[in-house]
């Protein structure tokens, strides 16, 4: 990545660490994400059958589900297993619900690859076309003289060598221009270097050649023939489909893509994607580093362990896995803290469906009603799973004597009623509801929470949050999750909310809240500790996944030999360990708040608000300091 883009990324990270709220980076924001709409009646396309009817034992699937649920680095959201176009296992891990679309992240790169395949089959593009020729009007004199031979195939295989990558998108609105003017490492075609902007440029090429957004180009060619109606794909500030990320898709619709590819591009007997493109895209054209994947990379498609198998792979656990020789397709959505193929979740799947799978396959196993019921019950347990409520302790941790088991309802309701009408003003407003990772992914930045209130009305418990000038009331599930809407700068997101009351070792009342972003990989958690007879509270926030990913990206920037001398002095003067600590405190912040009565705004608080505003301005100025 060029120095300008790196510095902009560092400025944004410093803004987070110094408590800046509101829009950051140099990319314009305009609300675009659509509300999902009705999820009460999820659409199903594939028939549901007993696994044994497709030659796979229910016991095998039960064991795999249990391993996935127990895996330390895996946070499963959805799992679909199909064979021969029949669903043999479906599980939506609580609080995630059936029929809701989910962010695909890089999984959608494979769909962008399909779009390129369509355009090539229509004679409007070729693999060996020079990318700079496609955008001839954008080329300056220097590019015309010195440009390398960068082809469409180099983009498809992640071998472009172009140094404008994902982190650079915060630096401005014209990503095509930034890509075309970026330096190239080595010679295109020599080395695999994973870069989402290669896929973005494929989308830009499709728009350049067709005059329409890629998502619109795909509707009559892919989405409509497959019956995919609930689909949303983000655009960049210039109105180009992002291509390498930004797609929301339901698991059942993702399965249609896998079934089609397993069948050589056919769906319901009709050729959708050209068979030649399916074969070419699922053949090895590049060798990634082993830490990313061990089996090779095709045209925007990863190879898998079993010979002939493939993966549409997205970070944090979004996958469509296809096994053409067995007719098996597996769809996963998750919030795991891992990238690429080398991960705990896929290791578990490979254990059951990888290279060794197939020896026990039969046209139809003898049905085992007991094993099947065990599978059904396991799915039900995982779909209704809820953490066991904590013990209510008496006398502090050292002198603990178990109180009555906090099983529900009476105790939880008592605590909720006790909090009714209590409102608090934050003493630091740099923390928002929207997870930091999602703020960056969607270029949608929080204004920070100013107030929080608690209300119990007609048997329902609510938390009220004020961010900026907007107040939103969220219902909290005390005995199971509740599905509510959260609006972040006019973009709608579905939340699964749960709450649990307990006491800490000091005898203080604690409220643990979890906000699962049901369309995303992220969860937001906060532990609220009530102190001094409810006059003060302390809020301890965290999000998953997030910390490790952000710190890894930060470390790569700070240790870059080319960029280090250009960094703001605040970064050069701090050790890497100190920067890690600051970032960890940013992702897992602790905030204090004091109680205010309804409508109360004292002169002292107004002065404090002015001080907070002045501090935010100073933080912004500090964040923008460069040598």
Model regions: which residues?
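N-terminal leader/targeting segments and the immediately adjacent pre-domain N-terminus
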Residues: 1-97, 120-125, 366-412, 416-429, ...
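Structural helix-adjacent loops and short alpha-helical linkers that scaffold large soluble proteins
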Residues: 57, 123-127, 164-166, 207-219, ...
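Active-site SXXK
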Residues: 85, 103-128, 155, 202-206, ...
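Active-site helix/loop module of the DD-peptidase/beta-lactamase fold
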Residues: 122-160, 181, 212-245, 249
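A small/polar active-site loop signature that marks catalytic segments
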Residues: 160-235
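Active-site-proximal alpha-helical segments within enzyme catalytic domains
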Residues: 198-205, 243-266, 318-335
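Active-site Gly/Thr loop motif
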Residues: 278-333
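Substrate-recognition/cap regions that form aromatic- and gly/pro-loop-enriched pockets
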Residues: 430-544, 552-559
């Amino acid at each position: 990545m060029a120095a300008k883009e790196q510095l902009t990324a560092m400025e944004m990270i410093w803004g987070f660490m110094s408590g800046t709220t509101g829009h950051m980076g140099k990319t314009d924001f305009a609300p675009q994400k659509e509300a999902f709409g009705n999820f009460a009646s999820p659409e199903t396309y594939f028939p549901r059958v007993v696994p044994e009817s497709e030659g796979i034992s229910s016991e095998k699937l039960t064991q795999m589900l249990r391993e996935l649920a127990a895996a330390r680095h895996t946070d499963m959201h959805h799992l679909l297993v199909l064979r021969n176009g029949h669903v043999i296992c479906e599980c939506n891990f609580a609080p995630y619900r059936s029929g809701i679309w989910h962010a695909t992240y890089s999984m959608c790169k494979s769909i962008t690859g399909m779009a390129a395949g369509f355009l090539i089959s229509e004679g409007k593009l070729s693999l060996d076309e020079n990318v700079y020729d496609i955008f001839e009007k954008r080329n300056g004199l220097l590019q015309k003289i010195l440009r390398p031979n960068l082809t469409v195939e180099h983009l498809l295989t992640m071998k472009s060598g172009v140094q404008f990558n994902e982190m650079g998108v915060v630096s401005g609105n014209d990503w095509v221009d930034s890509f075309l003017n970026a330096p190239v490492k080595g010679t295109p075609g020599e080395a695999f270097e994973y870069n989402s902007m290669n896929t973005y440029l494929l989308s830009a090429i499709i728009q350049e050649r067709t005059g329409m957004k890629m998502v619109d180009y795909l509707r009559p060619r892919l989405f409509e023939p497959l019956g995919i109606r609930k689909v949303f794909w983000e655009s960049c500030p210039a109105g180009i489909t992002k291509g390498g990320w930004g797609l929301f898709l339901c698991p059942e619709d993702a399965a249609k893509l896998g079934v089609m590819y397993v069948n050589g591009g056919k769906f319901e007997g009709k050729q959708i994607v050209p068979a030649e493109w399916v074969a070419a895209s699922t053949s090895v054209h590049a060798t990634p580093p082993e830490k990313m994947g061990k089996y090779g990379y095709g045209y925007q498609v990863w190879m898998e362990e079993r010979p002939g198998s493939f993966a549409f792979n997205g970070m944090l656990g979004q996958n469509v896995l296809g096994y053409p020789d067995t007719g098996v397709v597996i769809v996963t959505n998750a919030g795991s803290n891992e990238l690429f193929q080398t991960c705990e979740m896929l290791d578990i799947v490979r254990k059951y469906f990888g290279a060794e799978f197939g020896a026990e396959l039969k046209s139809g196993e003898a049905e085992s009603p007991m094993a099947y019921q065990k599978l059904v019950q396991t799915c039900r347990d995982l779909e209704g799973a809820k953490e066991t409520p904590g013990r209510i302790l008496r006398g502090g941790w050292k002198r603990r004597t178990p109180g009555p088991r906090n099983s529900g309802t009476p105790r939880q309701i008592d605590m909720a009623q006790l909090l009714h009408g209590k409102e608090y003003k934050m003493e630091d407003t740099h923390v928002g509801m929207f997870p930091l990772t999602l703020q960056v992914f969607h270029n949608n930045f929080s204004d920070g929470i100013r107030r929080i209130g608690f209300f119990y009305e007609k048997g329902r418990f609510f938390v009220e949050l004020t961010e900026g000038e907007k107040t939103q009331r969220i219902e909290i599930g005390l005995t199971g999750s509740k599905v509510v809407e959260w609006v972040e700068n006019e973009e709608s997101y579905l939340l699964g909310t749960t709450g649990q009351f307990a006491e800490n070792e000091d005898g203080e009342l604690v409220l643990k809240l979890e906000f699962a972003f049901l369309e995303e990989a992220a969860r937001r958690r906060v532990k609220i500790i009530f102190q001094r007879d409810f006059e003060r509270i302390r809020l301890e926030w965290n999000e998953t996944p997030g910390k490790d990913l952000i710190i890894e990206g930060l470390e790569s920037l700070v240790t870059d030999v080319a960029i280090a001398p250009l960094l703001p002095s605040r970064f050069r003067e701090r050790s890497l360990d100190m920067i890690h600590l600051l970032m960890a405190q940013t992702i897992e912040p602790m905030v204090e708040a004091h109680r205010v009565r309804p409508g109360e705004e004292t002169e002292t608080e107004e002065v404090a608000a002015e001080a907070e505003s002045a501090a935010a301005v100073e933080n912004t100025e500090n964040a923008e300091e460069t040598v």
